[in-house]
Amino acid sequence: EDQAEIVGVFHSHPNHPPTPSQADLASCEYLDLPFYIVTPETSDWYYFEPSGYEKSLIGREWVWDIQDCWSLITDWYKQKKNIVIKHWKRPKSPKEFSESPLFEYGLPKVGFVEIDENDETEVGDVLLMDTTNTGKLDHVALYVGDQTILQHCVKRLSSRETYDQKWIECTKKRYRYAQ
């Protein structure tokens, strides 16, 4: 990037057809670059360009920094509120992130403010959670009303879930987008 203009993304799907995954389609949109996918064993190629693809909020595969709990929040705000949340620099891997979660740092930088524990939870509030009981705030979910959250846990598909006692106990802080 510092030495020349990036004109496309080339990558392979070993032992699989070159059909784009949800993450490929999302990355293509995010980077605004054409993608070329090859299956090395067969030399089959697939080419595609940004086309306005929007990821579904429910049922997406978990991929760090592309389709994870934080990207679910930003995608919900874009799709439901027409608000584009700025990206903030995150560690390159989930392992690095787990050692030093940065949600408390990142949320205020992109327009969220912590809300008082006495305030009612509203649709669109971000719930900052400690899911490992280690004191590290390692997960975010989105309150969508009617005691329901939208979330994307590691190695699971994104889903709506009841905001029950388990998730309430994991919730340590709540943030609201300050428009």
Where on the chain are the PLM-derived regions?
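Active-site nucleophilic cysteine motif
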Residues: V63-K80
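Short, flexible active-site loops
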Residues: G52-W62
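Divalent-metal-activated hydrolytic enzyme cores
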Residues: Y30-E54
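Short acidic alpha-helical/loop segments enriched in Asp/Glu that coordinate divalent cations
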Residues: N82-K95
